[in-house]
Amino acid sequence: MSDENFTAGTFVSHIASNDSKSLLEIFSISTGVPILYQIKHQFFHRSGFVYASEFQKQHDVEFSKFPSLGEIAVQVNSMKAKFDIAFVDPWHEIEDSFQIIEIALKQLHSGATVIMHDCHPRNPDLRAVSAPEVFPYAWCGSTWTAWSLLTQALTSDFSWMTIDADYGIGVLKVPETKSQQKQLMRLMLSLSKRWTSGNLLRPEWS
C-alpha cells in the first residue's frame, strides 16, 4: 500500500479483521468528517459522533447546532456497547485530544485499538497552535503534542506506535488486564489535569 493511498481511514479498514466487529468514531466537524467515507470495512456495529469545539461555536453560528465534546462524552459513555476499534479525530487542541482518548477508552474491549489522526504532521505550518480562520484548510494543530506527551509517559508495558503517513496515525492498544486499563486511564486524567494547570511542558517536535 503506497503512502499516497495509506490514510487513517484506509488503515482502519486494513486492520479490521473478522474479529473486529464494532467501530466507534468521534470527530470534530471541521477536522475529521471526510475520513468517515474512507472506511470501507463492513462492521457489525458502527457508531459515529460528531461535535463542534467551543472555538468553532464562538466563531461560526453554523456550528452551534452540533453538540460539544462534553455532551458527546455523556452520549458515548451512556451506551452499553463496547467496541473493538475507536477512530478519533479531535479538534486539534491538546485538551480535546486528551479528552477524546479518555472518552474512547471507556467504551473499548480489552485488547481493543485506539486510532487517532494527525499525530505526526511533518509540515511545521500544519502544527500551528492557532486554528486557521477559514475551513476547509489543512491543520493538525496540537494533537501531535497530546499524542507525544501520552506516549512519552507510557511504560514498556503498553503497546503503541505512530505511523508516518497521512499526517501521522497514532495507534494504541487497550491493555488486556483491568489493572493496566485503570493505570492507563489514571495517566490520561493526570496528563489532562497537569496540562490544564500549566504543570506540563510542551515537547519539542521530533
Predicted features along the sequence, with ranges:
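A short alpha-helical cap/connector motif
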Residues: 1-87, 91-206
